[in-house]
Each structure stands twice: as structure tokens, then as C-alpha cells.
Amino acid sequence: MLRKGDLTQGGITGTLLHFTLPMMVGSLLQQCYNIADTLIVGQCIGAGALAAVGSAYTLMVFLISVLLGLTMGSGTVFSLHYGAGNHVALRRSIFSSFVLIGIVTLILNVAVFIWIDPILQLLQVPQDIYGMMHSYLWIIFCGIVFTFIYNFYASLLRAVGDSVTPLWFLAVSVVLNIALDLFFILQLDWGIQGAAAATVLAQGVAALGIIIYTYRRRPELRWHHEDMCFDRTCLKEIASFSTLTCIQQSVMNLGILMVQGLVNSFGTAVMAAFAAAVKIDSFAYMPVQEFGNAFSTFIAQNFGAGRYDRIHRGVRSAFVTAVVFSLLVSVLVFVFAEPLMLIFVRPDETEIIAVGVAYLRIEGAFYCGIGILFLLYGYYRAIRMPGMSVVLTVLSLGTRVVLSYWFASIPEIGVTGIWWSIPIGWLIADVVGIWCYRYVKGVRGS
């Protein structure tokens, strides 16, 4: 009998796409949290506020990368237990990981409130936007617990094959976020603080909704009194996946943050262009990123069930799908780069538009590289080799950072060199990851 959310049965391509589609839509909606702030702030307040929100978002993603890494790693453990049909181990891992990530969230919150000023100074944030960025981050981290709760339960539901429910709660949250943005900024004139408050309140609604749904509608995922213990084997398994995934996310976002610091040194105009272009860039490749996350769940369930033949066929299907989709998006971004920038920037800000268009056309040409890399990350996490995902991340981000600083120091290249360093890092990591896959495939029979 086919279990609800079982990815070990049925047609591979259809199963993957059916599971992925709600995740893709949900991920695009997730981007709307920050894009709504960026669009309304950029059009209603100005370029300085746009630069502040964009730079704050990059820092925020880096700081919560620990939480995201822990939830992603825990999600892989949940998928393995669900695929193997071990519900006792599943419930115990849910309890243990929830407590662990909750403690980390509290520590992170305290750390941010203590060290927010030294961090902003280290990033060379210009004085004209320093106050706005400080206020925005302070409010956002007051509600970081909502980010933890929503992402934890969304990861849990996706791990057991339910990618639709998180989408519904996220959709309600995004609509509320946009409505509150308009109300707080246009009606109450709260400025950038209003944008941050809108995001926190909207995330709170999503968090409350998803936790109530899980406890009422999915009793098999509700831990019991006997599950509320820190089993050594369970904790070791969670730590094995979560720690390395956490390191991967931290390294990834540290590299991005270092590049952000370099971009900041070129002034407010380049910062604003980068902020707007990165939102478009993230929006463009986010579907294939979620496809990689869905692919990881698919591989983990089949690995737990011992379906190695299905894993091999799934790899081929996923790579073809990712490449075709990435090529289509590359063409669209290249052609419509300037109109896309005008969504966030006023037409008279020509310097910002020109810098942003250059970024998008360089990045957009190489979306196949990042699409393949997301699949490789997901594959290695799912087959109990999360360390390989870390290696690929270090390769990709290390190349990006080194080349960014080198190219930017050459006057003839300047800021454009930063844009070129990003796809070069993707392609180098792809080559290494594919070569290692051929070896692992032979050894593990997958």
C-alpha cells in the first residue's frame, strides 16, 4: 500500500515534479518576504533605504544560516527514517532536533543583539544607511523564533512527502506581509522599521499556523512522552547531518557576506544595484534550488528504503530537468534584465540600472551551473555524505571570494570582476561534484 508522501514508488519524473512544484511556488513566495520590502522601500523611500534592506538581507541570511543548516540536516534524517518506515526513530529525532535548534536560536538571538554594531562596522556599511540597517536588523531578529518554527515544521512536512501544506501557510503570510508593508510605510510612515515589522508579523502567522496544523492533522509526527528523551544514537545521527549541513550553509553565506563587504566598498549606487539584482537573481534560480531540495528528499527516502536502482534513474531525470529549466530562465533574464531592474529602481537612476543589468546578464548566462550544483548538494546529503556538500561549497565560495577580490583590484575590470567570479565558482564545483558522483555510484551501487 502506498503511504502518504511516499517517494519510493511511482514514476520518477512525475513524482519528482509533483513533489517539487509546491516547493518551487513556496520558495518563490518566500522570496516575496524580502522582495516586498525591497520593492516598496526602493520606490517609496529611496535608494539609500534600498541599499540598507538589501545589505541587511545578505547579513540576515548569513546569521540564520546556522538554523537553516540544522533544519535541512534534520530534514534529511526525517526522510531516511520515514523511507525506512521507522516511526519511533522519526518521532524521537523530531523531538531532539526541535530542542537542539530551539537552543541554538536563543543563543543566536542574544549574540546578534550584543554584536550587531561591530558586525556592521566590519562590513563597511556607509554612514548614510548605517542607522536604517541597524534598525531593520534589530526588529527582524526580535522575531527570529518565528523563522525557526516555520522552517522546522516546513522541513518536517516536506521530509515526509507533504510539500503542499507549507505552501498554503506561506501564501497567507506573504499576502499579509505585503499588506502590512503598504500600511506601515505608506499610511503610518514608519519607514524601514515598518518593513521589518511587517515581515516579523507575517512570519509569526505562518509559524503559528503550521505548528497547529501539524499537531492536529498529522498525529504520527506528534512526539509522545516516551519520545521526549535525548537518545544517544538519535542525537549522533542528527549531529552528523546537521553539523555538516550547518557548516555548509555558514560557509556559503560567509562567502556571500565577504563579497557583500567588497561590493559595499564601491559605494551606495553599486550597493543598491547589487541589492536589486540579487533579488532578481535569487528569484530566477530559486525554483531549481527547491528542485534540488526536493531531489534530496527523494534520494533520502529511496536510500532509506534501499531502492538504489531508483536513485540512479532519479539522478538522470533530475539533471535533465534542471538543465532544461535553467536554460529557459537564462534566456528570459538576459532578455528582460533592464525591465526587471526597473521594478525596483526608478528610471532616472541610470547608474544603478546599468550596474544591475550587467550583473544579471553575466549571472543569467550560467544558471545551468548553479542548477547542477544544487542537485549535487542534495544528492550527497541524502546518501549520508554531507561532508562532500561542504567540500563543493568551499570550492564554489572560495573561488568566488578569491577571484572577486583579485578582479576588483584590477582597475580595468573593477566591480564587473565580482560578477564573473560567481559563475566560475559554480562551474569548478560542478566538475568536481560530477567526477566524485561517478566514483560514488560505482562504490555504492546507486
Residue ranges and their predicted role:
Residues M1-T20, F78-G143, Q187-T243, I299-F366, ...:
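Short alpha-helical transmembrane segments in multi-pass integral membrane proteins
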Residues Q9, T13-C32, A36, L59, ...:
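Residue-level signal for short hydrophobic patches within transmembrane helices
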Residues H18-D37, I139, Y150, S173, ...:
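Transmembrane helical elements of multi-pass membrane transporters/channels
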Residues M24, L28, C32, A36, ...:
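Generic alpha-helical transmembrane segments of integral inner-membrane proteins
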